[in-house]
């Protein structure tokens, strides 16, 4: 090894042994150029460092190896990164979260390029667990994990990181970017959409759309299109966005989504034939946006919505009559819809196979069983937890020096007095 590299290894060992992590972070930030100039010796450097004891030094070397324009031996580097993430010291890498997250981004990009997303899923799950201070903390690696799960069509590994409500963001030494936040909620919404958990999907798309913004984001635009479609499938109408939504949405994003607004407008007429005509008219747009599958589900949900409307008018109805009223092709298709809706708990009915009559029933749920009481208890606990969280956040803001300074300034402006100077 060159003398400069030997000095780097010795410094990493010494600072790690002394527990001087801040100084070690400064060293690895300055050593990028040195390591890049000595690519052929980097595996020797890795051999001289212990992953557990010298995690930050190993991280610096792997980051530089992955930063090179071309990777000569990807399989070796992949194995090195896999071993590092599974065995590194979590307390150490939290001093260099920006570099650690950067390494995960590089790994993700390399696997996406090679069309091997499945290989990175378990590695990124380990990386998130190492980096998080708590399970409610969002990191930029969350977006990478969701991206790989989507590309691999393997959604379930991401669910433990989506089902929790995020209360905090890992700043990553200033490297956390709004793009990571938007991608987490956009990809998360797509995963929930794929699993037909439309309620949670709608919430995730809403988070992406309502992110404070001063410019148009393509991620926000795509989230908005899916938000409209999922709203129609879940609620039968487009759910109104919160008042705090950025003006960017109304001014720029809505005009770029005209086909989707037309779809929502025609959907509200409850006429499937007109909706089919509009889908055919804008099929190129929907296909280009990769939303044709959701659009077809909108059409299917309109049939279901119209069947639900019949339950408020009729006690019994023949399948033939239902098919003509709802504009289905015939009694067989009507029966298929009714059976699926009964199975999903969307209507309460029974079909008499002898005469093809559908009998609609009242909701059998009396809301007095132990399971329902347990659900109510769980919802109450969530409300209590939310109240405690809000109180803690309020207290945190109250003692924040910037908030106190602004509050004092506004009070002085209101009273017309000038701030006093103390010596």
UniProtKB/Swiss-Prot annotation:
SMART domains (UniProt xref): PINT (SM00088)
Major subcellular site: cytoplasm
Stretches the record annotates as Disordered: 402-423
UniProt domain PCI: residue ranges: 197-365
Localization, UniProt: Cytoplasm; Nucleus
InterPro entries per record: COP9_N, CSN3, CSN3_C, PCI_dom, WH_DNA-bd_sf
PROSITE patterns named in the record: PCI
Pfam families assigned to the protein according to its UniProt record, in alphabetical order: COP9_hel_rpt (PF22788), CSN3-like_C (PF21215), PCI (PF01399)
Record GO biological process: protein deneddylation; regulation of DNA damage response, signal transduction by p53 class mediator; ubiquitin-dependent protein catabolic process
Gene Ontology CC terms, in alphabetical order: COP9 signalosome; cytosol; nucleoplasm; perinuclear region of cytoplasm
Keywords: Cytoplasm, Nucleus, Signalosome
Similarity-based family: Belongs to the CSN3 family.
Oligomer and partners: Component of the CSN complex, probably composed of COPS1, COPS2, COPS3, COPS4, COPS5, COPS6, COPS7, COPS8 and COPS9.
Summary of the function given for this chain in its UniProt record: Component of the COP9 signalosome complex (CSN), a complex involved in various cellular and developmental processes. The CSN complex is an essential regulator of the ubiquitin (Ubl) conjugation pathway by mediating the deneddylation of the cullin subunits of E3 ligase complexes, leading to modify the Ubl ligase activity.
The protein, known as: COP9 signalosome complex subunit 3
Organism this protein belongs to: Gallus gallus
């Amino acid at each position: 090894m060159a003398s400069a590299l030997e000095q780097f290894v010795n410094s990493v060992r010494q600072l790690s042994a002394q527990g001087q992590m801040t100084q070690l972070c400064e060293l690895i930030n300055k050593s990028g150029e040195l390591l890049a100039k000595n690519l052929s010796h980097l595996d020797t450097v890795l051999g001289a460092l212990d992953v557990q004891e010298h995690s930050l030094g190993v991280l610096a070397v792997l980051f530089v190896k992955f930063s090179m324009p071309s990777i000569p031996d990807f399989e070796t580097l992949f194995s090195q990164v896999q071993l590092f993430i599974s065995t590194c010291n979590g307390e150490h890498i939290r001093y260099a979260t920006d570099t650690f997250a950067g390494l995960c981004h590089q790994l993700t990009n390399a696997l996406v390029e090679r069309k091997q997303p499945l290989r990175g899923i378990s590695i990124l799950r380990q990386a998130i667990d190492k980096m998080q201070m708590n399970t409610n903390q969002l990191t930029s690696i969350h977006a990478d994990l969701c991206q790989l799960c989507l590309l691999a069509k393997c959604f379930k590994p991401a669910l433990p990181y989506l089902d929790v409500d995020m209360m905090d963001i890992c700043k990553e030494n200033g490297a956390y970017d709004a793009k990571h936040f938007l991608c987490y909620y956009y990809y998360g919404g797509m995963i929930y959409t794929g699993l037909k958990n439309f309620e949670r999907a709608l919430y995730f798309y809403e988070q992406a759309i309502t992110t404070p913004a001063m410019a148009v984001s393509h991620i926000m635009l795509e989230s908005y299109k899916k938000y409209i479609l999922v709203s129609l499938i879940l609620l039968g109408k487009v759910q109104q966005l919160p008042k705090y939504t950025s003006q960017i949405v109304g001014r720029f994003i809505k005009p770029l989504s005209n086909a989707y607004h037309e779809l929502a407008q025609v959907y509200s007429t409850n006429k499937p034939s007109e909706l089919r005509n509009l889908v055919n008219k804008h099929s190129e747009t929907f296909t280009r946006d990769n939303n044709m599958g959701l659009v077809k589900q909108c059409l299917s949900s309109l049939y279901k919505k119209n069947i639900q409307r019949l339950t408020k008018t009729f006690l019994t109805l023949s399948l033939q009559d239902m098919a003509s009223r709802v504009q289905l092709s015939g009694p067989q298709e009507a029966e298929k819809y009714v059976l699926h809706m009964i199975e999903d708990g969307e209507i309460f009915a029974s079909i008499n196979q002898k005469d093809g009559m559908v009998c609609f029933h009242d909701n059998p749920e009396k809301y007095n069983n132990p399971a329902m009481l347990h659900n109510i208890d769980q919802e109450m606990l969530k409300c209590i937890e939310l109240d405690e969280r809000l109180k803690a956040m309020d207290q945190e803001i109250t003692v924040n020096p910037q908030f106190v300074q602004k509050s004092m300034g506004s009070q002085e402006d209101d009273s017309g007095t000038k701030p006093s100077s103390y010596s």
